[in-house]
């Protein structure tokens, strides 16, 4: 069973997936910082200087806090500002992944086109096969007895 597990892990697809997950996690942090630290402040400035992450609707009359964290401590809230921030994170990440996949597909198509244009050159046959081919050709040219 251990050998099967080693073979499973050593396969290329599993290793590629592991690398993709690790890079994706790190890249997700970059996109989150991009949205939280660069995009959302600009959007907030355009729409009145507010921080979208603190936009919420109280779902009970007991909630009267100015920030989302304090409001959550007081009761149930509908935190649509946090949702908008996460949605923008997702859309940016999905767009970047789409562009990366599109670029990889384009490169694959270019390689496939090149392979179709260049016929595959077979290596020359071994010397003994060449000799046998020459003998066959000479025998074929001899008149029948």
From Swiss-Prot:
Alphabetized SUPFAM superfamilies for the sequence: Gated mechanosensitive channel (SSF81330)
Chief place where the protein resides: membrane
Cell compartments where the protein resides: Cell inner membrane
Membrane topology: Multi-pass membrane protein
Family of this protein: Belongs to the MscL family.
UniProt xrefs under NCBIfam families: mscL, PRK00567.1-4, PRK13952.1
Domain of life: Bacteria
Protein's name according to its UniProt entry: Large-conductance mechanosensitive channel
Role noted for this protein: Channel that opens in response to stretch forces in the membrane lipid bilayer. May participate in the regulation of osmotic pressure changes within the cell.
InterPro entries, A to Z: Mechanosensitive_channel_CS (IPR019823), MS_channel (IPR001185), MSC/AndL (IPR037673), MscL_channel (IPR036019)
Leader peptide range in chain numbering: none
Gene expressing this chain: mscL
GO CC terms, sorted: plasma membrane
Originating organism: Rhizobium etli (strain ATCC 51251 / DSM 11541 / JCM 21823 / NBRC 15573 / CFN 42)
């Amino acid at each position: 069973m251990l050998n099967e597990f080693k073979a499973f892990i050593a396969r290329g697809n599993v290793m590629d997936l592991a690398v993709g997950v690790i890079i994706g996690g790190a890249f997700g942090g970059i996109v989150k910082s991009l949205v939280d630290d660069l995009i959302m402040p600009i959007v907030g400035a355009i729409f009145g200087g507010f921080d979208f992450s603190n936009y919420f609707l109280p779902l009970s009359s007991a909630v009267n806090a100015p920030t989302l964290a304090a409001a959550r401590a007081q009761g149930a809230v509908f935190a649509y500002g946090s949702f908008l921030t996460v949605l923008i994170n997702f859309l940016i990440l999905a767009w970047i992944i789409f562009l990366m996949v599109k670029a990889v597909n384009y490169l694959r198509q270019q390689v496939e086109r090149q392979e179709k244009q260049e016929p595959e050159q077979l290596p020359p046959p071994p010397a003994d096969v060449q000799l046998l081919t020459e003998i066959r050709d000479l025998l074929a040219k001899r008149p029948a007895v």
